[in-house]
Amino acid sequence: MVWRVAYTCLLFLAACSSPTQDFQTKLVPIGNFRLGQIVPRADAELTKGPLSRTASHEEWVAAVNDAFKDRFSRFDGGSYYHLGITVNGYILAKPGIPIIVAPKSVLIFRVIVLEDHTGKVLTEKPYQITVIEQLKVSSLLGSGYTSSREQQINNLAQQAALSTETWLRRQPWFEGPDTIVEL
């Protein structure tokens, strides 16, 4: 019984960590991955969820571009890969009723991966990922109370980049030979 409580506490603490906290630890390569270009965009019919604050296409594109550049420009593998990111929908939590109704922010986006050397699209179809704002002590109040709209956008974009990295690490694409020619 005690180990279950300890394990639950450990999971809770892990969920409370920042999406950029791992920047402080040693970088573990993703095979031969090196970021080529990021092509962020927001769907022409970007879906704003119910009871959400409003965010523009431009705000999402800028936040996603910055978060993905920060996360993926750290990798210096031997082959370039390009990431296409499309924001499809979001909910930016408004203030709710603390503890009783604490709305969560959500981001839905799709990712495609293109290998630079061959020009081949590695994803058969765009891979959809949904991120929900991280669990924090302040989540009991709801991020609508504790975070500005801009902070919510940036936090979701950082979580999107982290979720994409986690997904990329499970793919077999980055085990081939290096293709970058150093002159």
Pin down the residues of each PLM region.
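Second-shell loop/turn segments in exported
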Residues: 50-59, 97-99, 142-151
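Sec-dependent bacterial lipoprotein signal peptides
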Residues: 1-17
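A beta-strand/beta-hairpin structural motif
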Residues: 65, 127-132
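N-terminal, post-signal-peptide region of Sec/Tat-exported proteins
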Residues: 53-78
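Surface-exposed short loop/turn segments
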Residues: 75-123, 134-146
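Sec-exported extracytoplasmic/periplasmic mature domains
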Residues: 69-73, 77, 92, 161, ...
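C-terminal/domain-edge helix-coil "capping" segments
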Residues: 17, 140-183
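A structural "domain/chain start" motif
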Residues: 16-62, 173-183
